[in-house]
Amino acid sequence: MSCPVIELTQQLIRRPSLSPDDAGCQALLIERLQAIGFTVERMDFADTQNFWAWRGQGETLAFAGHTDVVPPGDADRWINPPFEPTIRDGMLFGRGAADMKGSLAAMVVAAERFVAQHPNHAGRLAFLITSDEEASAHNGTVKVVEALMARNERLDYCLVGEPSSIEVVGDVVKNGRRGSLTCNLTIHGVQGHVAYPHLADNPVHRAAPFLNELVAIEWDQGNEFFPATSMQIANIQAGTGSNNVIPGELFVQFNFRFSTELTDEMIKAQVLALLEKHQLRYTVDWWLSGQPFLTARGKLVDAVVNAVEHYNEIKPQLLTTGGTSDGRFIARMGAQVVELGPVNATIHKINECVNAADLQLLARMYQRIMEQLVA
């Protein structure tokens, strides 16, 4: 299949960019962007490669994405080696095909076509690319955003190419994401012999009423954009492995995916009040990996919806479901942020694949978004 989007996607897949190793992907993208007049600024932090590229001036539309991928798992279970892109029955197989090297290729080809047709475009077109989204994400988009904010860089609109679609490309557009807050809680007791409970203090027994009340809380009812806040216990650990020792500590890890009805401080206050109510001795550590954000109907959402309707003749759903993305960092700049990408049915799985025709369609959608906002 001869298509610039497919060919570039295949070139990217051949580079085994296991997070945070870029494996040469960004050099390939930079070469293409510089060829059409983009200024490129590399912004590497520690082991992570990032770049910020721009062309033109004024109102700014950025396309954001990541070159890194998750490990392929058992390569023998793939129908073809995971880093050897193969097209079968119209599907392009390879690690990163959907998440998100196909989107990156579609963005770059869309930019090439857009610049060819609008060499003197009115606004500024930009790219924010990182090699660490799948792993810690500590030195990726968040660091670039901090650097851009420190120098008052302008960013009005941002299109993140994460695989947002469910069945056909564009059927779901993410115009926001829930916040994510993790609590690492240790309940302290006194270790002892199970035959002498009066000489010990069992933290599991003490914590049970607290945990029972915690899981029963209705945090909020959500709103028209967000589902209700969810709390899930992810890990519980206690004991020595022996059946005759009362443990001295209980470790509980739980995560909140929260809506704009709450703040992380409100959640923390309610959890701490509950711990005090049950008179527990504890230490607690919080990790906020992202605040909730929402892009309401406006120029970016309208442009994305228009592009999907024009090329796929469907009306996309605007949703905020799913995990976190780098959009949570970019939203701090005050930009309107929307995610539009290919079907996500096989991401992170054995035999990850994407419909080759969808990538061609996606490039057309991206180009139309550029034309509506910065032409």
Curated annotation (Swiss-Prot):
Listed pathway(s): Amino-acid biosynthesis; L-lysine biosynthesis via DAP pathway; LL-2,6-diaminopimelate from (S)-tetrahydrodipicolinate (succinylase route): step 3/3
Family matches, as Gene3D superfamilies: Zn peptidases
Keyword Amino-acid biosynthesis: yes
GO biological process, one term: lysine biosynthetic process via diaminopimelate
Keyword annotations from UniProtKB, A to Z: Amino-acid biosynthesis, Cobalt, Diaminopimelate biosynthesis, Hydrolase, Lysine biosynthesis, Metal-binding, Zinc
Residues holding Zn(2+) 2: 99, 134, 348
Substrates-to-products reaction catalysed: N-succinyl-(2S,6S)-2,6-diaminopimelate + H2O = (2S,6S)-2,6-diaminopimelate + succinate
Catalytic residues of the enzyme: 68, 133
EC identifiers of the protein: 3.5.1.18
Top-level taxonomic group: Bacteria
Gene Ontology MF terms in the entry: acetylornithine deacetylase activity; cobalt ion binding; succinyl-diaminopimelate desuccinylase activity; zinc ion binding
Binding site for Zn(2+) 1: 66, 99, 162
Top EC category: hydrolase
Cofactor binding note from Swiss-Prot or TrEMBL: Binds 2 Zn(2+) or Co(2+) ions per subunit.
HAMAP family (alphabetical): DapE
NCBIfam families, per database record: dapE_proteo (TIGR01246), PRK13009.1 (NF009557)
Family designation: Belongs to the peptidase M20A family. DapE subfamily.
PANTHER family to which the protein is assigned, alphabetical: ACETYLORNITHINE DEACETYLASE, N-ACETYL-L-CITRULLINE DEACETYLASE
Subunit structure: Homodimer.
Protein name (Swiss-Prot/TrEMBL): Succinyl-diaminopimelate desuccinylase
Species this protein is from: Escherichia coli O7:K1 (strain IAI39 / ExPEC)
